[in-house]
Design a protein with these regions (language model features):
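N-terminal Rossmann-like FAD-binding beta1-loop-alpha1 element of flavoenzymes
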Residues: 296-323
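C-terminal catalytic lobe of FAD-dependent flavoproteins
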Residues: 590-708
């Protein structure tokens, strides 16, 4: 059961503030709903040949248009990616309040005999929207800055919510050559708020024949002329939904939305803008896009959370994969723990690391919900409990750090909020007697069940196979792709190969120079008894303690760099216990922690110095060093590294370095790599993608003109 903060924390704005920030585009009567439906059907018909239709929407409004796009999608062979840009972040609680109080989705249209058929249709329309609205609310959109990716219907519908300054959000994204935005809808209350620079950023992200529609443009001649001229100067055609729908009703035929061939000069200016963007980030090469001829030619080495979720993200796109796991079962490495905490890593500055982990945590949480949904077909159970995570300090230094995080930002309460000692005791259901920071949407998940469920779903959706007991000892690059070798067998060639093999990530010649370190972690399993069994949330202090699952709590974990063995260690078992005593001294429930059974599990997690995971092209380190020798600390060297694609092993990719928070970061990192491989828009900004790149440690120095 999700632990919820108090309602006053969740809804900070009253209804009048909400309707001012998120106004309805028009009265939700039969007239508007009919026009909206006709217009959106026209968009889908105009782009019916697209396997993935990418649409952009400026403004969330009251959410009606978003839900209607979702509802209108009818082509079973077409996927929809809807990118919504909204300057004012909103969470699920406020969105529900807005809908409940405005009756947007439930109010009945006053009966008019001559509109009887339209009104009946409108009520049916609203009924369908209500179901989608509840599905959207269940996904828990939160009021954070940046992109939140919401995936529905096994990948058939994807909604990217980009919250924050629209110009900033638009400019932070890269053009997707294979799947650009085909059409934009701009809600009227934001027309004047868009600057000309924003128009150009929209053009950068768009197909050259992309069009724009808005509502009520013709009602203001001054606004109409100014807006249309600005968009036309960027190569767009602008249409009014009212006029499109009226024309369609009049001639009883679809109206084309591709009205003209943009001026060649304007298209060239768009291309220049894209090239400037690409040049600025040339040092961060993207994955080579899979062609239709190589649809089944991708291999993934690894049997844990990373490989499973990459297979799932690929499968949602219809892309098959072959997964190679050295163990007899999935999830036997770092993903083999009984319980793992899932919550975001926050920093006082809310920098790229903090923002990435918020996005990733929410994405992973939604994955768990989708895979365990009552409507999921042949679902594989995932033991989990979104009971919240309560972070407390364990000494003076950690208290100062936690205070900086709490006071550093006006954190959305659905992400985290401060609690006093009394509130902490009430949340935990055992006495802690100290204040903390509560993550209400967090909790714990069983990692190996999570990985297995992802693989099982992937196998339902696409041609995904798993080869167990297959220990890949070497990989070789040949003219026609990558070949995988065991002691006795040979697999391939594969056009693309992803290394997602956890602790063995650096075992191959092509990956052994990655700047990443193994850390041993021993997790203690202790019986649930007496006061301890009442624990109702995950505790994180000097170590962590989970609520009971199948009669056991998880207590951990040790942190030993470059371990010599993975055997049970009595000393680490006692250290885990002492960490709890240091964190919550003199509490009576500590006596209930019984370590006498020596029950524990040992695993290895791969950790990067900057705490970001690694996702992207495998760096060709010998070639980097060779180029460095030729461009060593000259005046031109920084420019060279800035504008030259960093050397990589073609067709080889890294997905790893998930550290101690792989449950939070792994699924989104996998989703981003799958999007790259399939040439689709990525739900991360350009700067964050650079932070994930496996070559970042070398490039960070080279871009600053420093010695390696």
């Amino acid at each position: 059961m999700t632990a919820e903060p108090n309602k006053p924390c969740q809804i900070k704005r009253d209804y009048q503030q909400l309707i001012n920030l998120y106004p309805a585009t028009a009265d939700t009567d039969a007239h508007y709903l009919s026009k909206l439906s006709i217009y959106q059907q026209q968009v889908f018909e105009a782009h019916s040949q697209q396997k993935l239709l990418v649409l952009g929407q400026i403004g969330l409004g009251n959410g009606l248009e978003l839900l209607s796009w979702w509802r209108t999608q009818a082509n079973p062979s077409q996927r929809l990616l809807l990118k919504v840009f909204e300057p004012n972040p909103i969470n699920a609680y406020e969105l529900k309040s807005l809908w409940d109080q405005s009756l947007t989705l439930v109010k009945e249209t006053p009966f008019e005999p001559h509109l009887e058929s339209k009104q009946a249709s409108a009520l049916e329309f609203k009924s369908e929207l209500c179901q989608l609205a509840q599905t959207l609310l269940n996904a828990e959109p939160t009021a954070i800055i940046g992109c939140q990716r919401l995936i529905f219907d096994d990948g058939r519908t994807t909604i990217d919510l980009h919250f924050g300054d629209i110009q900033t959000q638009l400019s932070s994204l890269s053009h997707s050559p294979m799947h650009p935005v085909q059409h934009w809808l701009i809600l009227p209350h934001l027309l004047q708020a868009l600057h000309h620079q924003s128009h150009w950023q929209m053009a950068k992200l768009s197909d050259d024949s992309a069009t724009i529609a808005t509502i009520g443009l013709s009602e203001s001649s001054e606004l109409s002329e100014t807006t249309v001229n600005s968009f036309q100067a960027c190569g767009f055609t602008v249409s009014d939904i009212n006029e499109l729908a009226t024309k369609a009703l009049g001639i009883h035929q679809p109206v084309t939305l591709i009205n003209h061939q943009p001026d060649a000069v304007l298209l060239h200016e768009r291309q220049v803008l894209r090239q400037q963007d690409a040049k600025a980030y040339a040092f961060n090469p993207m994955a080579a896009i899979l062609s239709s001829a190589t649809q089944s030619s991708i291999a993934i080495i690894g049997g844990g959370l990373a490989s499973a979720h990459l297979a799932l993200s690929l499968a949602e796109r219809g892309q098959g994969a072959q997964v190679f796991c050295k163990d007899a079962e999935l999830g036997q490495g770092a993903s083999g723990n009984r319980q793992g905490a899932i919550y975001p890593l926050l920093t006082p500055e809310n920098d790229e690391l903090s923002r990435f982990f918020q996005q990733a945590f929410l994405f992973s949480r939604r994955r768990v919900q989708a895979l365990t949904s009552a409507t999921a077909v042949n679902q594989t159970p995932i033991s989990h409990d979104f009971c919240g995570v309560l972070q407390t300090a364990h000494d003076e230094r950690s208290q100062l750090r936690l205070d900086k995080i709490i006071q550093g930002q006006p954190w959305p309460s659905e992400i985290a909020y401060a609690v006093d000692a009394e509130q902490a005791n009430a949340i935990a259901k055992i006495n802690l007697d100290k204040p903390g920071f509560f993550y209400p949407l967090g909790g714990w998940v069983c990692p190996f069940e999570y990985a297995d469920a992802a693989i099982q779903k992937a196998m339902q959706l696409a041609d995904v196979s798993v080869s167990l007991n297959t220990d890949i000892l070497a990989i070789e690059r040949q003219a026609d792709g990558w070949v995988l070798l065991t002691e006795k067998e040979r697999f391939g060639p594969f056009a693309q190969l992803v290394l997602a093999n956890g602790a063995e990530l650096t075992q191959f010649d092509a990956s052994n120079k990655l700047q990443i370190s193994p850390f041993r972690g021993q997790v203690s399993h202790v019986p649930a008894q007496f006061q301890l069994s009442q624990l109702a949330t995950v505790l994180c202090a000097n170590g962590y303690l989970t609520p009971s699952h199948q009669g056991l709590h998880c207590l951990g974990a040790s942190y030993v760099k470059e371990p010599e063995h993975l055997d049970f260690c009595p000393q680490e078992q006692q250290e885990n216990l002492m960490k709890m005593h240091e964190s919550y001294p003199n509490q009576s429930w500590l006596a209930d922690i019984d370590m006498s059974g020596n029950n524990a599990r040992v695993g290895v997690r791969m950790v990067t110095r900057d705490h970001f995971p690694m996702m992207g092209c495998a760096p060709d380190v010998p070639k980097i060093l060779k180029d460095y020798a030729q461009h060593q600390l000259t005046k031109e060297s920084r420019h060279y590294w800035q504008t030259t694609p960093a050397p990589v092993h073609q067709g080889l990719y890294i997905l790893g370095g998930l550290g101690s928070r792989g449950l939070s970061s792994g699924p989104l990192a996998a989703e981003c790599l799958a999007a790259q491989l399939c040439g689709e828009p990525i739900p991360l900004d350009k700067e964050t993608l650079c932070k994930l790149n496996p070559n970042r440690m070398w490039l960070r120095k080279l871009l600053k003109g420093k010695a390696l």
